[in-house]
Regions:
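Conserved catalytic core of nucleic-acid polymerases
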Residues: 109-115, 161, 165-168, 221-224, ...
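Conserved catalytic alpha/beta cores of large enzymes that bind or transform nucleotide phosphates
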Residues: 33, 310, 316-331, 342-377
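Conserved RNase H-like, two-metal-ion catalytic cores of nucleic-acid enzymes
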Residues: 1-79, 83, 288, 332-334, ...
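A short acidic-Thr-Gly-centered motif at the start of a beta-strand
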Residues: 26-30, 302-317, 471-476
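Short glycine-rich phosphate-binding loop at a beta-alpha junction
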Residues: 33-40, 203-205, 322, 386, ...
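Polymerase palm active-site segment centered on the conserved acidic dipeptide of motif C
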Residues: 181-210, 404-418, 498-536
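Conserved "right-hand" nucleotidyltransferase catalytic core of DNA-directed polymerases
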Residues: 1-11, 53-55, 72, 83-85, ...
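Short, contiguous acidic/charged loop-to-helix segments that flank catalytic cores in large enzymes
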Residues: 9-13, 68, 266-271, 306, ...
């Protein structure tokens, strides 16, 4: 049966002695037993805030469910309770009591007031949470075996510990530069607004379509119209339009976004004592890729002014290790045929080879970025007409595609094969044995199946690498500390110097390359520097 360890309830005489409660929590968290939880990273961060270091193993029923069925409309504890045991969470009465007692908005927004509620009111809800979590765990075990996802769920559960320690560290920020950059952007905003006003002959609201339309009409600048007859001033159009008015509006919008989204809305809001604490979502997308939030570090501009804000700990250096061209390499791993085998042999001999430079031999006049676009189009099911539009015209598009498929026909064959498997078997598995389900999927979803295979595999590789570097002691909590995982890159702060640093970086690369055996080897680039910009 469950019980509630109650302490720190505001003004409640039934509170357990705080030190006794914390000592008991410490005892539980340091046991080698399995800890079954729901949203483990969130709860364990509170535990760590009390100076308690929880020990693995952990099992998170919400993470497990994402591996069992990636298409649930909700992965909340209440939603899974309804699915597995026919019983969800009903906290309405508790939230209503808090609303009546403390005011504010109704519903879940009252969660922050629960500590102020009496123990006798909170205890039943707390016990239901614990009981529901265990009931779901027991029910899930049957489905885990049936779906044959034991291996990938084990990986996700072993990932909880290193990500927990990573999240708790935060990343040191150059707060002086942060303040200075905020001031620079304010001055820049005034200059850009003044320039726009001079071009338009009046003040223009860059977020009001009608106002922009009027400015364009006054200057006789053409603009696209939607099917419904409305003007369209998208970011892509403004960026591609050569008219000074379009460029000025685009610059103003970009400046505003940088100010609101990154300086005021992200960095300043989440920096505490000189460190930025971002949230990391272990399965942040249907592909199982990780994501970050509050703030989303993946959206940090590729701009020195912003990336220089992220700095190493005092007296240390940052190390960045980034998978090079992981998607095309993983795609080639799945390809077959004589031509594919020849390309694999080349990469096995020289793993550092530039994938896109090789692909460009099929069309020497094509730029690197265009060739990347062509490859992704072939893999991810983009039509010839759509791709030709991006390439400029149908004739050019057809020529480039023809040359590409003639030189590298195995990529198109891979795409066709994967879609065929989805239609017949109704699921595919990634390199880490992650199951991607297609039961009842429509043709549009199946058309993009290779995306799931490649993106899901890239997620598996990064996660396995993190678990391995943690378990093998390559990263630790002393002199080689993991700070962030952003796309295909890990960022580390280290006090190591000279040969010790070189050895650690070599080991980091080795672990990342060897995460999973692939017929086309992975390649990792690592660099060191004082800040995030330097390591690129």
């Amino acid at each position: 049966s469950s019980f509630y360890v109650a302490f720190r309830h505001d003004g409640d005489s039934s509170n357990m002695d705080e030190q006794v409660a914390l000592d008991y929590l410490k005892y539980l968290m340091e046991l080698p037993n399995l800890k079954v939880m729901a949203n483990a990273n969130f709860d364990l961060r509170f535990v760590m805030a009390e100076g308690i270091i929880p020990k693995a193993p952990f099992f998170d029923v919400l993470l497990a469910e994402r591996c069992i069925n990636e298409y649930r409309s909700s992965y909340s504890l209440g939603a899974l309770g309804e699915i597995y045991v026919g019983e969800g969470k009903n906290e309405d009465a508790l939230y209503e009591w808090c609303h009546q007692s403390f005011g504010g908005r109704k519903g879940r927004s009252q969660a922050g007031n629960i500590w102020r509620a009496p123990i006798k009111l909170v205890e039943p809800y707390a016990r239901v949470d614990a009981e529901l979590t265990l009931d779901i765990y027991n029910k899930q075990q049957v489905l885990i075996k049936q779906a044959e996802v034991i291996e990938i769920i084990d990986l996700e559960m072993r990932l909880i510990e290193p990500l927990l320690h990573m999240t708790a560290k935060g990343i040191r920020m150059d707060t002086d530069k942060l303040k200075s950059l905020g001031g620079e952007l304010v001055v820049e905003s005034r200059t850009l607004t003044k320039t726009l006003t001079q071009i338009a002959g009046r003040v223009v609201n860059v977020n009001a379509g009608r106002d922009i339309q009027r400015a364009f009409d006054d200057l006789g600048v053409p603009y696209p119209i939607t099917d419904k007859g409305n003007p369209s001033f998208t970011a892509d159009f403004l960026k591609s339009c050569d008219a000074p008015i379009a460029q000025a509006i685009s610059a103003c919008r970009k400046n505003t976004k940088l100010m609101s989204s990154f300086i005021d809305g992200a960095y300043k809001k989440y920096v505490v004592n000189g460190r930025l604490y971002a949230g990391f979502n272990q399965i942040g997308a249907v592909t199982a890729r990780m994501s970050s939030s509050k703030p989303n570090l993946q959206q940090t501009p590729r701009d020195a002014r912003f990336r220089e804000l992220f700095i190493a700990d005092e007296g240390e250096v940052l190390v960045g290790a980034d998978y090079s061209q992981i998607e095309p390499r993983l795609a080639l791993h799945y390809c077959s045929g004589e031509q594919a085998d020849e390309l694999k042999e080349l990469f096995n001999k020289t793993p550092e080879s530039d994938f896109y430079a090789i692909l460009m031999t099929s069309a020497p006049d094509v730029e690197r970025q265009t060739m990347k676009m062509v490859l992704l189009a072939q893999l991810y099911g983009q039509g010839e007409a759509s791709l030709s539009l991006k390439l400029g015209d149908a004739v050019t598009g057809k020529r480039i595609l023809g040359s590409f498929n003639s030189s590298f026909p195995f990529f198109r064959r891979l795409s066709d094969t994967v879609r065929g498997v989805c239609r017949t078997r109704k699921y595919i598995r990634t390199v880490g044995k992650r199951r991607c389900n297609y039961q009842g999927a429509d043709s549009v979803v199946i058309h993009k199946a290779v995306n799931r295979l490649i993106q899901g595999g890239a997620a598996d590789i990064m996660k396995k690498a993190i678990v391995d570097m943690w378990n093998q002691g390559v990263v630790n909590n002393t002199d080689f500390k993991l700070l962030a995982v952003i796309h295909d890159e890990v960022i580390i702060t280290t006090s190591l110097k000279g040969d010790d640093l070189k050895c650690a970086m070599d080991e980091l690369e080795r672990v990342m390359v060897e995460a999973y055996p692939t017929t086309c080897p992975m390649h990792v680039d690592s660099n060191k520097g004082d800040n995030w910009w330097d390591i690129h």
